[in-house]
UniProtKB/Swiss-Prot annotation:
Formation of pseudouridine at positions 38, 39 and 40 in the anticodon stem and loop of transfer RNAs. Keywords: Isomerase, tRNA processing. The gene is truA. This is tRNA pseudouridine synthase A. One of its GO terms (biological process) is tRNA pseudouridine synthesis.
């Protein structure tokens, strides 16, 4: 039997998703909890491998098992053995042809940025920070130049293992929440797939433009250079959330994971 799970986690305490020798990763904690509940080893695959400090609203994983339980039991039983900052949101049997990564039609991320003269305290680790006021119109103008199918080599980490730097960036929405010198900015990204550190590198450039350090058209120069050296430094992981992959409704997953329903809504820090 193949089972899919929707996972939500706060990534502050972890060295990313992927299993490490230290055992301090989300995958390590999840597989340990699944093994305790199922009384057998279970290996998982995920839709998107998040980096250290990155959060997830709807990570999707799948695994194969001979253990037969009701979906609700998988959710409740696994959560019993998980730490408080990781929780299974749903469990769903899927056909053997389903693959959480290969079957995804799109992926969505959100960056939450606090604009304030004072660094975040209560939301430390859950939002990024800019002490400088940002120009939303300038950032949106730059974002519009990024949308489409491009070679994103300038926004790719040196350790990126993707076969191709060409990705279809389908949407960037930038929304201001609040007014004055203390507000939040939400940057939502949707693409067929993302390169390693791609969003954090895009954020570094967008914030530089928002501060007025570069004009919006500069982003095109960075894109066309296809060189990491010309882009802004990689932005903090603190405010980055994996909103989740989107699948065809034929797989029978919950609405928050289907393309037709638009995916999971963000309900983190306002």
């Amino acid at each position: 039997m193949r089972l899919a799970l929707g996972i939500r986690y706060n990534g502050q305490a972890y060295e990313g998703w992927q299993s490490q020798r230290s055992g301090r990763t989300v995958q390590d904690k999840l597989e340990a909890a699944l093994a305790k509940f199922a009384a057998q080893p279970i290996g998982t695959l995920c839709a998107g491998r998040t980096d250290a400090g990155v959060h997830a609203l709807m990570q999707v994983v799948h695994f194969d098992t001979t253990v037969e339980r009701e979906p609700f039991s998988w959710m409740r039983g696994t959560n019993r053995f998980l730490p408080d900052d990781i929780a299974v949101q749903w469990a769903q049997p899927v056909p053997d042809e389903f693959h959480c990564r290969a079957s995804a039609l799109a992926r969505r991320y959100l960056y939450v940025l606090s604009q304030s003269p004072v660094r975040p305290s209560l939301d430390s680790g859950r939002v990024g920070w800019s002490m400088h006021p940002l120009d939303g119109d300038a950032m949106r103008a730059a974002a519009a130049l990024l949308v489409g199918k491009h070679d994103f080599s300038s926004f790719r980490a040196s350790a990126c293992q993707a076969r191709s730097p060409v990705k279809d960036l389908r949407r960037i929405e930038i929304t201001r929440v609040g007014s004055g010198d203390r507000c939040r900015w939400h940057f939502e990204f949707e693409a067929d797939a993302f390169l390693h550190h791609m969003i954090r590198n895009l954020m570094g450039c967008l914030v530089r433009i928002g501060r007025g350090d570069e004009r919006p058209e500069w982003i095109t120069e960075v894109l066309e250079a296809r060189s990491r050296k010309v882009a802004a430094p990689t932005f903090s992981a603190n405010g980055l959330y994996f909103l989740g992959p989107l699948y065809d409704a034929k797989w029978g997953l919950p609405a928050e994971a289907t393309l037709q329903a638009g995916g999971a809504p963000y309900d983190g820090p306002p």
